[in-house]
Structures are given as C-alpha cells and as structure tokens.
Amino acid sequence: MNRLWLLVCVLVSMSSCISSKMIANNMVGSMDDMKTSFFAEESPTYARQAGPALMKMLDGFLVSSPENVALLSRGAEMNCAFAQTFLDDHDRTWAQVMYKRGKGYGMKGLSLEYPGLAK
C-alpha cells in the first residue's frame, strides 16, 4: 500500500512539472502580444509600473522551461529595453541588474541555438 501511495505521489509531481513546461512553451505568442501592448502603452508611468510584473511572469515561464529559446529571446529583449527606457537615468544599480539578466538570457539562448558559439 505504501508503494502505491509513493507511485501516485511521484506521478502527480511529474504531471505537474510536465504541464508547467507545456504552459510555458505555449506562452510565446501571448508574451509577444503582451510585449507589443507594453511597447505601445501611451503612459510611460503605467508602462514603468507594469514592466516588472511582466518580466517576473516571463521569469516564471523560464523556470518551467529554461531551454526555451523563444522565451529566452523575449527575456533578453524585455529586460534590456526596460533598463534602457526606464532605469538608466534614474536607478543605475537596478538597470545593471536588468542588463545582466537580459544578457544572461540572450547568451543562454544563443548557446542553445548555436552550440559551438561559446567556444
């Protein structure tokens, strides 16, 4: 009986991980729509306030699917664009964190897409 419960727990855990990855992988189109909406926002104040939440959501998708090149590309673009647009002049420390994260996402995506690039 204990083995049965262990098997059930393992299967439930595995299905949760698989479905999280599937959801993340299917979010690329939605992230593109959100990115378009973000860059088209007429209120810079609203865009600045919404940006961190959008990027945290993208970070969460990358936790579920860390080798998704499309999501890594969006992460690189969004983090660097946010840093340049909203942080460079006002908060250099935060800007540097965002640039570093964006660069990390970009380099990881490139190394996955072009395996010999890092050598």
Task: Label every PLM stretch briefly.
Residues 4-13:
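Sec-dependent N-terminal signal peptides
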Residues 13-38:
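Bacterial Sec signal peptide processing site at the extreme N-terminus
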Residues 29-60, 64-67, 78-119:
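Short coil/linker segments at helix-helix boundaries
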